[in-house]
Amino acid sequence: MWIKELELKHYRNYDHLLASFSSGLNVFIGNNAQGKTNFLEAIYFLSLTRSHRTRADKELIHFDHSTVSLTGKIQRISGTVDLEINLSDKGRVTKINALKQAKLSDYIGTMMVVLFAPEDLQLVKGAPSLRRKFIDIDLGQIKPVYLSELSHYNHVLKQRNSYLKSAQQIDAAFLAVLDEQLAGYGARVMEHRIDFINALEKEANTHHQAISNGLESLSLSYQSSVVFDKKTNIYQQFLHQLEKNHQKDFFRKNTSVGPHRDDLAFYINGMNANFASQGQHRSLILSLKMAEVSLMKALTGDNPILLLDDVMSELDNTRQTKLLETVIKENVQTFITTTSLDHLSQLPEGIRIFHVTKGTVQVDSDIH
């Protein structure tokens, strides 16, 4: 899939913008604080209905206005699709082909994106919540049912935690009802995650071995807070641990086990990647991003759109070459932001260059 056209109204520092793109590489050049990242954020927002930079939707609205409108014309294998998001103080409205979508799980996945931003370099050593978010964003685009089950899980989790905080003593019968619901949704969330990580590991290891010239292997491990011996037993063992932890959870006023506390670990040649060098970290993250692209295509039959936000300068020539070779080979529409073309070691034919200045975008040229 690829974005043919994007229109922004009152988004960040863009009062109004209408732009069309190449189905291949699109490079956005400009000084800092001109709107390059805002532009990629808009594509991300149109795909996932959320920003990767802020939780406050009001920050997305141009200072002179009270509403935001994003529309995009997306070319999929199945045909052209029009996406639209309208944002105001009353909330957000999402539409596909002018039809309002009642649930996020009906909207997300229509346009898949993979974002590679400087903050992704913290994925390995950062907080576990970053790694859970990484899994949830990918799985939500690949499997709409996952978003629905995760939403149900979070709703029951909120109910359970609220009860634990307010209760004067344990009502075992009431907790048992919540435990069964939480274990049911949670087990399915974990099953989806485990299958996804196993598939992602194979793709990521293939890319990592290519980047390291066969010297390094990359493995991933889903770290569950629920102890289980095999995937088919997750529900029963999750439920058992919830029941076992009633007193502990009551004392702590929260739920101590479940997918909301799970993590993801990375290993290079069998060694925890927390102890890897900076160069190895960059190779690992690059391998993951390329694996996201190839796995989404393998599981859905369509390519995602790749957003590279000021990361090319973080990669040496070898890693840049591997990345560009992959997107060209896989025919992935790619958006790159940079302050200078000097940060790109080589540019293939058929790219479109845009100059970004104070919320305006001007097409420079197509290189053939």
Swiss-Prot record:
It is found in: Cytoplasm. It holds the Pfam family SMC_N. One of its GO terms (biological process) is DNA synthesis involved in DNA repair. The keyword DNA damage applies. One of its GO terms (molecular function) is single-stranded DNA binding. It comes from the Bacteria. Keywords: ATP-binding, Cytoplasm, DNA damage, DNA repair, DNA replication, DNA-binding, Nucleotide-binding, SOS response. Gene3D superfamilies: P-loop containing nucleotide triphosphate hydrolases, RecF/RecN/SMC, N-terminal domain. ATP binds at G30, N31, N32, A33, Q34, G35, K36, T37. GO terms for cellular component: cytoplasm. HAMAP family: RecF (MF_00365). Belongs to the RecF family. The RecF protein is involved in DNA metabolism; it is required for DNA replication and normal SOS inducibility. RecF binds preferentially to single-stranded, linear DNA. It also seems to bind ATP. This is DNA replication and repair protein RecF. It comes from Streptococcus pyogenes serotype M2 (strain MGAS10270).
